[in-house]
Amino acid sequence: NKISPNPKHTYKIVSSNNILLDAADKIVDEKNMDIIVMGTRGITNDKKITFGSHTLQVLKYVQCPVLAIPNHYKYKQPKHILFPTNYLIPYKRRELKLLCEMASPFRASIDMLYISRSETLSMRQQDNRNFIKDELHKNIINFKTTNDKNISNAIYTYLKENSIDMLVMVNSRLTFLESILFKTTIDKMSLYLDIPFLALQNISRENL
């Protein structure tokens, strides 16, 4: 299909006979890409699979934020964004700025969901929380807490009960996303995404 013209964007078609993951990593590195946008379904289009295998590989391993768009998703402005976190890892300024710039034109509110049995934060967690607040200063930030023992269920419940338009998570060790990405069926995940999903990367990268 022909891409509609947009004065704010230019489009270039890139062809590669390489493996998708390798090709994506190469162009991200060469062009210092800010974000990858892709669909969530592969050739099988299996309704029991949340992400296609290609999407999973890119989400987990490419050193760049990835915005995954569900199959048959109808565009709507992202007015309400969910960002589950444990506040245990330092966040990248560049990637939080990306989220801020994506959300601010729509005056979106961002719900930071802390999933824990205790609302008390360590000094490290408090520092990371303050950093997020500073970097997302253009947006309305709501700090929420839930004590649900099942992370996937906690996220799924919050998505459905609060009319969330976009889910944001960080791909790193010791984060919620790491465990969720390795569970692909609805029965295992209890999380079926029908909204855009932005995966930020806590991976070393040059030119940050």
Predicted regions located by residue number:
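Structural beta-alpha unit
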Residues: 2-36, 137-187, 191-195, 202-208
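Residues at the starts of beta-strands that form the adenosine-phosphate
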Residues: 10, 79-80, 107-111
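Intrinsically disordered or low-complexity boundary/linker segments at protein termini
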Residues: 38-40, 60-95, 191-208
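Glycine/threonine-rich flexible loop motifs
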Residues: 45-50, 177-181
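Charged helix-capping and loop-helix junction motifs
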Residues: 51-54, 126-129, 181-186
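Active-site phosphate/pyrophosphate- and oxyanion-stabilizing loops and adjacent acidic/basic residues
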Residues: 56, 100, 130, 156, ...
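Redox- and metal-dependent alpha/beta enzyme cores, enriched for Fe-S-associated oxidoreductases
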Residues: 93-137
